[in-house]
């Protein structure tokens, strides 16, 4: 079963894969950040948001994974096998947990739309050949100042506010006909 943990939040594993693995802070730093910013909400028995729930689950999952890794480390006698297991957990599972924690902390801190815009911007930037792209990658904390995302919060897009001239013309003859029919009756 291929489950994408970002799907319900409007992102995908592929979208996050554009960010290099060294982009994400350590699990310890991310867990400390989540705790410092959202401890009350994470420990609350009440539901706060899907991001809080996902953060809570990722932190619990990492704790269980560390318990398992410790058990394996203590019970595997072959040092080569032990190292393989520890490296696999840290490299593969660690990266996935770091991505999850970063995504949900960022969504809670900056807003989901801003984070998605950042992921798209970074994806475009990284895929653009170096000769044709700006020297610096987009920065999440400055993104709200430079993107269109803020305009969406203020109101509708211009396309919705102003109907196209075609619509106006096609609606007005119908109105005239219906009004004239009513006046004839």
From Swiss-Prot:
A motif (Bipartite nuclear localization signal) lies at residues 160-177. Residues 157-179 are annotated as: 3 X 8 AA repeats of S-P-R-R-R-[PR]-S-Q. InterPro entries: Hepatitis_core, Viral_capsid_core_dom_sf_HBV. One of its GO terms (biological process) is microtubule-dependent intracellular transport of viral material towards nucleus. The modification Phosphoserine is found at residues 157, 164, 172. Residues 149-178 have a biased composition (Basic residues). SUPFAM superfamilies: Hepatitis B viral capsid (hbcag) (SSF47852). It comes from the Viruses. Residues 136-185 are annotated as: Disordered. Its main location: virion. One of its GO terms (cellular component) is host cell cytoplasm. Coiled coil: none annotated. Homodimerizes, then multimerizes. Interacts with cytosol exposed regions of viral L glycoprotein present in the reticulum-to-Golgi compartment. Interacts with human FLNB. Phosphorylated form interacts with host importin alpha; this interaction depends on the exposure of the NLS, which itself depends upon genome maturation and/or phosphorylation of the capsid protein. Interacts with host NUP153. This is Capsid protein. The gene is C.
């Amino acid at each position: 079963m291929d489950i994408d943990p970002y799907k319900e939040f409007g992102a995908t594993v592929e979208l996050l894969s554009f960010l290099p693995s060294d982009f994400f802070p350590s699990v310890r730093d991310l867990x400390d950040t989540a705790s410092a910013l959202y401890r009350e909400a994470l420990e609350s028995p009440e539901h706060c948001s899907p991001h809080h729930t996902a953060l809570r689950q990722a932190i619990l999952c990492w704790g269980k994974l560390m318990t398992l890794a410790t058990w394996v480390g203590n019970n595997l006698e072959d040092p080569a096998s032990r190292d393989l297991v520890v490296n696999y957990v840290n490299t593969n599972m660690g990266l996935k947990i770091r991505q999850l924690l970063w995504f949900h902390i960022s969504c809670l801190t900056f807003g989901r739309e801003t984070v998605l815009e950042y992921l798209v911007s970074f994806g475009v930037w990284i895929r653009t050949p170096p000769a044709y792209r700006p020297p610096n990658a987009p920065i999440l904390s400055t993104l709200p100042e430079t993107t269109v995302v803020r305009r969406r919060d203020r109101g509708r897009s211009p396309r919705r506010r102003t109907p196209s001239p075609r619509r106006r013309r096609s609606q007005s003859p119908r109105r005239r006909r219906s009004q004239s029919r009513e006046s004839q009756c």
